């Protein structure tokens, strides 16, 4: 959500509307969602990944960092949007946006046991202190070692136990190839002619 006026922010706050911000998408269109202004007006905001094409990923921690950089750059203030608030925006605030904050988003008695476990035994995550800050500023989806949903272990040692990953990847590639042939966009899937030794496409 971009291009929101002060009046529209007030309406969003008054109506209890939740807002999702896709920081990479906002940067790609040379704009920003006024996350700080929304938060300070009482609007619940969560960071999201939006999509993976054409140059994005589904790495939520990467998007979180881009969101921090965008807003700190905009306000020219490194203290804008704390790391802790950003982490809340992909956990409890995201659950709130889905209307599931009584079930998900935080580790509390009575809530579902949905956990993401990170492998911290990696050089970029050392030294091991201020772990939440390490998570926000240095970790990525590649550091996720295990995932537990409703108490059920679905991924361990970076291996998903409930699906055959290779067959899914093979099927996805096959469908993508069909889509290129069907739409006539196969040439667009190649490397840009000006990829190397050029500052502009």
Predicted regions mapped to residue ranges:
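Short, acidic/turn-prone active-site loops that include or flank metal/cofactor-
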Residues: 23-27, 50-53
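Active-site microenvironment of metallo-dependent hydrolases
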Residues: 91-201
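Conserved strand-to-helix beginnings and helix N-cap segments that scaffold or border functional pockets
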Residues: 9, 31-32, 57-60, 129, ...
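Histidine/acidic residue-rich metal-binding segments in metalloenzymes
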Residues: 1-18, 29-45, 102
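His/Asp/Glu-enriched, well-ordered alpha-helical/loop segment
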Residues: 36-125, 136-140
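Flexible loop residues that form catalytic
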Residues: 1-2, 72, 121, 152
């Amino acid at each position: 959500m971009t291009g929101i006026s002060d009046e529209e922010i007030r309406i969003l706050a008054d109506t209890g509307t939740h807002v999702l911000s896709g920081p990479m998408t906002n940067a790609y269109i040379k704009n920003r969602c006024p996350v700080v202004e929304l938060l300070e007006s009482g609007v619940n905001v969560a960071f999201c990944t939006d999509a993976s094409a054409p140059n994005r990923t589904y790495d939520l921690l990467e998007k979180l960092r881009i969101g921090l950089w965008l807003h700190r750059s905009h306000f020219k203030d490194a203290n804008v949007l704390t790391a802790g608030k950003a982490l809340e925006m992909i956990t409890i605030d995201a659950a709130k946006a889905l209307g599931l904050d009584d079930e998900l988003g935080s580790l509390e008695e009575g809530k579902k046991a949905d956990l993401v476990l990170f492998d911290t035994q990696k050089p970029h995550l050392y030294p091991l202190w201020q772990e939440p800050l390490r998570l926000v500023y240095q970790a990525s989806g590649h550091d996720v070692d295990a995932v537990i949903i409703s108490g059920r272990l679905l991924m361990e040692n970076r291996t998903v136990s409930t699906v055959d990953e290779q067959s899914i990847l093979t099927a996805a590639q096959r469908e993508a190839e069909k889509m290129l042939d069907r739409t006539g966009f196969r040439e667009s899937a190649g490397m840009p002619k000006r990829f190397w030794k050029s500052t502009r496409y």
